[in-house]
A protein has these predicted regions:
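Conserved catalytic-core segments of large NTP-driven translation/proteostasis enzymes
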Residues: 1
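ABC ATP-binding cassette signature C-motif
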Residues: 4-187
Length: 187
């Protein structure tokens, strides 16, 4: 089952968002209110502003005009197209424990080690340094760290990039029971 923090009444509200790069208008007067448990898929051609919209929601990019209101109980988790910088000398288990030792579930709690096993890092790999992982394993580890932070709004920017089939199946199973909002494309 998935984990996530409680989501209050106010979630994420976009009001009259406008964003351009040079002469290219990506969004004009875009308004949307995300509701509890929404599953929102953003579609569009390459370069149409899908990632920019996600970055605006996350606060990584400012709109040219309009407002983004984030509710007080909202905890965003943003899985970007690029991995965050990882300390290659850290052990896998320590990287995850830096996010959380345990995460709460509706049935109790799950340890960082148990979550690592669930995401295909057996105990024999958990004390390996990050520098020894493959690119795909680092991507999976980055995803797990975001999930360990117990977000209730999960933004997945091209989550299928560099994830193997097993990890995609795990992610889909996780999202089936995720008790919050999911915003994504290409899943």
């Amino acid at each position: 089952e998935s984990i996530g923090s409680r989501l209050g009444r106010t979630t994420v509200e976009l009001k009259d968002i406008c964003k351009s790069y040079g002469d290219k208008v990506l969004m004009k007067d875009f308004t949307y209110i995300f509701l509890k448990n929404d599953r929102v898929g953003i579609i569009g051609q390459n370069g149409s502003g899908k990632s920019t919209l996600m970055k605006i929601i996350a606060g990584w990019v400012q709109p040219d005009s309009g407002t983004v209101e984030i509710g007080q109980t909202v905890k965003l988790g943003y899985f970007s197209q690029e991995n965050e910088a990882m300390d290659e000398s850290l052990k896998v288990i320590d990287y995850i424990r830096n996010a959380a030792e345990y995460v709460k579930t509706k049935d109790g709690s799950i340890s960082a080690s148990q979550m690592l096993e669930r995401f295909l890092f057996p105990s024999s790999m958990q004390y390996t340094t990050i520098g020894k992982l493959s690119g795909g394993e680092k991507r999976r580890l980055y995803l797990l760290r975001i999930l360990m932070e117990a977000p209730n709004v999960l933004i997945l920017d091209e989550p299928t990039n560099d994830l193997d089939i097993q990890t995609l199946i795990l992610l889909e199973d996780y999202l089936d029971t995720f008790p919050g909002i999911v915003i994504t494309f290409r899943l």
